[in-house]
Amino acid sequence: MTPLDNEISRRRTFAIISHPDAGKTTLTEKLLWFGGAIQVAGEVRARKASRHATSDWMELEKQRGISVTSSVMQFPYRECMINLLDTPGHEDFSEDTYRTLTAVDSAVMVIDSVNGVEAQTIKLLNVCRMRDTPILTFINKLDREGKEPIDLLDEIESVLGIQCAPMTWPIGMGKRFRGVYHLYDDAIAFFDPQAEKGTAEIIQGLDNPRLDELIGTQADELRMDIELVRGASHAFDAEAYLSGKQSPVFFGSAVNNFGVQSLLDAVVDLSPPPIARPSVSREVLPNEPKFSGFVFKIQANMDPKHRDRIAFLRVCSGRFDRGMKVKQVASGKMLSINNAITFMARDRSTTDEAWPGDIIGIPNHGTIRLGETFTEGEDLRFTGIPSFAPEHFRLARIANPLKIKQLQKGLQQLAEEGATQLFRPLSGTDLILGAVGTLQFDVVASRLENEYGVQVIFEHYNCATARWIHGDAAELRQLSDRYSANVALDGADDPVYLAPNNVYLNMVKEKYPNLRFLEAREVA
């Protein structure tokens, strides 16, 4: 095996997806703790003290207890190198989550046992399904009274349309929660909330008399449950899992550390190493000798002391070496990357090398955009980083007119990293913001104040939807001349039609048949 093949086989790059409050941030912390990456699992409930969850580092996230940016964390576990991408937990940030899901090879879906499948989970799973992403399921909060496990599996199968293959099975729930049975190891792990790793004892075999000693009549209930589960549920099928058709299911309680290590072991044992990536011209294999990668996220001011911008790049093929010359395909320029970094949320360190599956950060001053491809020279363009038409719009006004330049710079940077979309109508000097959800405006206002020293006022803007305009240049000029207040340039200087309502949108579509009005576009 070549060094490249060896490093590829060791990589596991995955994201955690869930509905808000299903316990995703807690699970992230506990995975890091079991992986030895952090010393204290900084309980989310302790946020009101000074200790905040490792992956929630932005000021607004600390105040509200939600993740609004995607964090990247790398740590070794067993013989593997784990790249864990935490995703925004609030429904307003589905676009950032979508972009993050383009950079992973698998995902862990967290389901709250009390609430079952929720709206955001459905949306995110649909995104995973578009790419056939393999999904492990962690059913969380078994220490609370929730839905029956068999009902939860039925719900996942019927609502999400994915087969479930239980790998562990819970013994009771809430106050009667005693642990889980491992269906493929024939072992029982007993739950103890006081034990450091959540597990009091592990025994082998359903017929072990120690089982009856420890849980009494629940032992016979468990034996009956397992007989039923083995007969009624799907057996684990590696091929079905890797093609996104089946999800292995684990039960646990992340807040009590229980079931987390089994999940982390499954990431190592079941999840795929880096996979081939589609580009416009061809499929790129991870073990190709030449380096390639794409930018799936840009984050400004990760450390306000440094006033920096970091482009998060997923390595797709070959090996990255510090100081190597790479081609920024969009501009055709060759760059030397001497200061690439790896992450543990806000903590960062300079890296000398990176392999397929790894995420590296490239510091820059606004010269790198979302979706850009980097290679050793080939004119590749990786596909699939989307930008969606916003559903909410605001007009940005500034309290202090002397700070208009800071406002323009701040909005341009925040738009380039994907925190919001910025539109400048062809007539006038208005700055219009578009967002998938209204919380994004709060985030933008907070960041403008904290990072750029600008107080902004957002006013309602009369716009129902936006559409990117492609097609005949002459018709585009006619449209722009006639409706200059409604045609705007976005952050990448692409033309956009800002429709006051659907009647106007349908009217211009009829009037300009050689133009296409697109709801989404690829960023690059």
Swiss-Prot record:
InterPro entries: EF-G-like_DII, EFG_III/V, G_TR_CS, P-loop_NTPase, PrfC, RF3_C, RF3_dom_3_sf, RF3_GTP-bd
SUPFAM superfamilies per record: EF-G C-terminal domain-like, P-loop containing nucleoside triphosphate hydrolases, Translation proteins
tr-type G domain span: 9-275
Keyword Heme in annotation: no
Single GO term (MF): GTP binding
Any one GO BP annotation for this protein: regulation of translational termination
Gene3D superfamilies, alphabetized: P-loop containing nucleotide triphosphate hydrolases (3.40.50.300), Peptide chain release factor 3, domain III (3.30.70.3280)
Annotated positions binding GTP: 18-25, 86-90, 140-143
Subcellular location, record wording: Cytoplasm
GO cellular component: cytosol
Keywords, in A-Z order: Cytoplasm, GTP-binding, Nucleotide-binding, Protein biosynthesis
UniProt keyword Nucleotide-binding, yes or no: yes
Annotated CDD domains: RF3, RF3_II, RF3_III
Annotated PROSITE patterns: G_TR_1 (PS00301), G_TR_2 (PS51722)
Function: Increases the formation of ribosomal termination complexes and stimulates activities of RF-1 and RF-2. It binds guanine nucleotides and has strong preference for UGA stop codons. It may interact directly with the ribosome. The stimulation of RF-1 and RF-2 is significantly reduced by GTP and GDP, but not by GMP.
HAMAP family xrefs: Rel_fac_3
The family this protein is said to belong to: Belongs to the TRAFAC class translation factor GTPase superfamily. Classic translation factor GTPase family. PrfC subfamily.
Alphabetical list of PANTHER family matching this protein: PEPTIDE CHAIN RELEASE FACTOR RF3
NCBIfam families cross-referenced by the UniProt entry: prfC, PRK00741.1, small_GTP
Protein name in the entry: Peptide chain release factor 3
Lineage: Bacteria, Pseudomonadati, Pseudomonadota, Betaproteobacteria, Rhodocyclales
Gene: prfC
